[in-house]
Amino acid sequence: MSKNSKAYREAAEKIDAGRIYSPLEAANLVKETSSKNYDASIDVAIRLGVDPRKADQLVRGTVSLPNGTGKTVRVAVFAQGEKATEAEAAGADFVGTDELVEKIQGGWTDFDVAIATPDQMAKIGRIARVLGPRGLMPNPKTGTVTNDVAKAIEEVKGGKISFRVDKASNLHAAIGKASFDAKKLAENYGALLDEIIRIKPSSAKGIYVKRVTLSSTTGPGVEVDTHVTKNYAEEA
């Protein structure tokens, strides 16, 4: 939906630009104004009062969305032997070691999440330049470097997402699909915001959550009331 298209303008007209909506109201509006041609992703953009240039204010983490993401998550697992067997049984889409590394060195990155056992990280170092810029590098902090590969696969396929503030102090995440019930979208948003608030850096001063906008992939943004920090799925 182009910003210059008639459909976008009609969708934008349904939103009061001077109003801030409750999470549930915003979810309903975003559903109503999303493209009807496909099941659009519902995204949240959060402006934080942090300075990402400071290591102790680099907000990043993971959260399990209670209602999932609505996406089919393709998982690549770097493991061998018994752990490779566990990964296959848990539903990993791609499992391997050297052959996976070589494939990625050749430019292949047809997966959404990479998980690795600790003993494979030396090999993965050879493809860090490929995985890193795409946000695919396994990391102990996000639970993707682990010996419990079955649990990690279950979590990411069940709705666990990673988030990280960017250089402009903005944080972006997908919290569901336009086909989701509005209450489920609001609950997913609440789970994400709760975790972001929980890990607030102690050195961050002033207003922490400055602005929140909810939107579909190509639809107009709806500003969400940052003061709502509980009962996200209730009527305003």
UniProtKB/Swiss-Prot annotation:
Keyword terms of this UniProt record: Repressor, Ribonucleoprotein, Ribosomal protein, RNA-binding, rRNA-binding, Translation regulation, tRNA-binding
Keyword Methyltransferase: no
GO molecular function, one term: tRNA binding
One Gene Ontology biological process: regulation of translation
Functional summary from the UniProt entry: Binds directly to 23S rRNA. The L1 stalk is quite mobile in the ribosome, and is involved in E site tRNA release. Protein L1 is also a translational repressor protein, it controls the translation of the L11 operon by binding to its mRNA.
GO CC annotations, alphabetized: large ribosomal subunit
Pfam families, alphabetized: Ribosomal_L1 (PF00687)
Record-given protein name: Large ribosomal subunit protein uL1
Self-association state and partner proteins as the record states: Part of the 50S ribosomal subunit.
Family per similarity comment: Belongs to the universal ribosomal protein uL1 family.
Regions that span the bilayer: none
Alphabetized HAMAP family for the sequence: Ribosomal_uL1_B
Organism whose genome encodes this protein: Corynebacterium glutamicum (strain ATCC 13032 / DSM 20300 / JCM 1318 / BCRC 11384 / CCUG 27702 / LMG 3730 / NBRC 12168 / NCIMB 10025 / NRRL B-2784 / 534)
Record-linked PANTHER family: 54S RIBOSOMAL PROTEIN L1, MITOCHONDRIAL, LARGE RIBOSOMAL SUBUNIT PROTEIN UL1M
Keyword Iron: no
